[in-house]
Design a protein with these regions (language model features):
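N-terminal secretory signal peptides that target proteins for export/translocation
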Residues: 1-2
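Bacterial N-terminal signal peptides
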Residues: 5-15
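Exposed, flexible binding/inhibitory loops of compact, secreted disulfide-stabilized domains
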Residues: 17-154
Length: 154
């Protein structure tokens, strides 16, 4: 009986030691997809405020973008690397937080090593994120080139 009580007490203590999720204060930013073929030809930030704008974007690119998510009070932000001549390029989410009136998002840009064997094909990597529709004046995406980039609230 004493062992069971000690075990339960130890488990309660350990449950308080669980690591925080990587987004921390930026829990309001949700990664929808990280794609290698979005179809956006130039590096940049694209903001879609509703499903109609998202459908217009999907119709204008030769790529694979996810469906509009059913998330209230959220817009979609696409951070794009543009066309790349080979495979092996990518962009991933690191963290997000508020910096005054700015929504600041940190990304990790990856490229193949110079001596890596990669597929010779055009790719267009991007990161699709759901961000809050209000409460910020500017969104800033930070990381290696082509970032940092900013986009004002419309």
């Amino acid at each position: 009986m004493m062992r069971t009580g000690s075990l339960v007490f130890a488990l309660i203590l350990l449950s308080g030691c669980v690591a925080d999720p990587p987004v921390a204060d930026g829990a309001e930013v949700q990664v929808i997809a990280s794609q290698t073929r979005c179809g956006l030809t130039a590096p940049g930030l694209v903001l879609a405020r509703n499903a109609a704008e998202w459908q217009a974007l999907i119709g204008s690119v030769d790529g694979q973008l996810p469906d509009w998510p059913d998330v209230a009070n959220q817009w979609l932000l696409v951070a794009s690397l543009g066309h790349q001549a080979t495979g092996g390029h990518g962009i991933g989410f690191i963290s997000a937080d508020r910096d005054g009136q700015d929504l600041s998002i940190e990304v990790k840009v990856t490229h193949p090593a110079p001596d890596a064997m990669v597929a010779q094909m055009i790719t267009s990597p991007c990161l699709v994120m759901a961000i809050p529709a209000s409460g910020w004046k500017q969104v800033r995406v930070n990381g290696e080139a082509p970032f940092p980039m900013t986009r004002p609230h419309p």
